[in-house]
Amino acid sequence: CLCRDGEILKNVPPLGYVLGDEGSGAVLGRNLVNGIFKGHIPLKEEFLAAHGLNYEEIIRRVYREGMANRFLASFTRFVARHIDRPELDELVCEAFRAFVRRNLAHYPADAEVSALGGVACHFERQLRHVLATEGMRAGRIVETPDEGLLNYHIWNRSE
């Protein structure tokens, strides 16, 4: 959302992991599974062994159990462990690029982009790279809301 002086001026809805949520852990996990099973990411055996899963189990967990978004988001740790692989670096950059183009493009180009959450923190290098290549200025990237609120009050306190 676009905020100024603590007030939300504009908000593009995320729409959840099925309809949107570009750049989220669920989308990274979904794209990872897609890339692995469609042969674009050559880490299938390692991925399945690391999670004790097979194709049928993944399909069952995604389509027949609740919280598929959390299940898919759990695979971001695998992405983080293998981020040195060009395929996974690009997977993350593509997700952030989609986020920027579908969400941030609706805000003023000169707005500083700050981010909150584990995905932004763990893939900060990729996020900053995408923001720069899309002509945007990166601000603070923090993992937890508490850290963000604390920094806000530290940097904006009146003395």
Predicted feature residues:
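ATP-binding/phosphotransfer module of carbohydrate and carboxylate kinases, centering on a glycine-rich
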Residues: 33-159
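Phosphate-binding/catalytic loop of phosphoryl-transfer enzymes
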Residues: 1-45
